[in-house]
Amino acid sequence: GGARGPAPLTLRNARTFRPFEYFVDMYGLPRYNEIDPTAFVAITFTLLFGIMFGDLGQGILVAVIGWAMWHFKQMPIGRILLPCGISSAVFGLVYGSVFGFEHVLDPMYKALFGLEEKPIEVMNSAMATNIILFAVVIGLTLIMLAMMLNIYSGFKQRNYESAVFGPNGIAGLVFYGSLVLGFGCQLLFDVHVLNLPYVLLLIVLPLVVIFFREPLGKLMAGEKDWKPEKWGEFIIQNFFEEFEILLSYVSNTMSFLRVAAFVLVHAGMMMAVFAIAELFGPLGFTIAVIIGNALVMGMEALLVSIQVMRLEFYEMFSRYYVGDGRAFQPLSVSADK
């Protein structure tokens, strides 16, 4: 009806991604000309779930339960659990964990790759450091991908302030990427790139650009009154905003440490299950391992889903997605008239 706000829409996605529209619905539908994040959510959610919940046995079980929930009860959540379970099983292969038994797959690694034992021993302290590093790298990558989506979305909507000059636009990407590159080279390879021109051009300049994003965006869009009305007010407000933006870069990146935490928590919880199980005889051991697996699986599937959803909404959506569109409702004749 008429020109009331943005045009309504229905989400249209490939069959594989369609179950994940559930999360997009929960957050808010895209505006008419905004990108539909379903595919990005589907891929990143499935990957993160698998990394944080890597167990070949439990993963297959989660997938089977998901399939059954969808097949027999038509529960949409089942179609989300199915790919997540498969992803979990794949990472379980990488971690060498089957229902918490950490060395069952060693013969397979030996046969296939000639390794003495599995490549990733999660509970090994040297490995734990690598897992934490890996989690941060995933975070950096996903945050930069979210920024790229925002740049694409901004150009599509002709919102230059957001796409070019904003904290999640080209300026933000250059700033964040340059910091990551600078510190990464320094810490990992001991290569010194953070010299004065690098810092001024790639770190300070983008920050200045972000500070003046409003007038710059208006200028680029060709608006006449691009200057702020009160410079004093503008400077104070943007000073605090800039500070908040810097904090969000740090906190969003650190937030991905939960990925590493859950990899370690999973291994730790299964160790606890086996420690308890070993107190019993053979029959008691079997029962304890089965109950322990069921408990850990149920609890972790829930916790990991919540954590991944948190990462999707707070760490990624907040960078590239508004989600205040409205759903398309086909016209219907109301019966109460």
Label the model's feature ranges.
Residues 1-337:
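Conserved, carboxylate-rich catalytic/transport cores that coordinate ions
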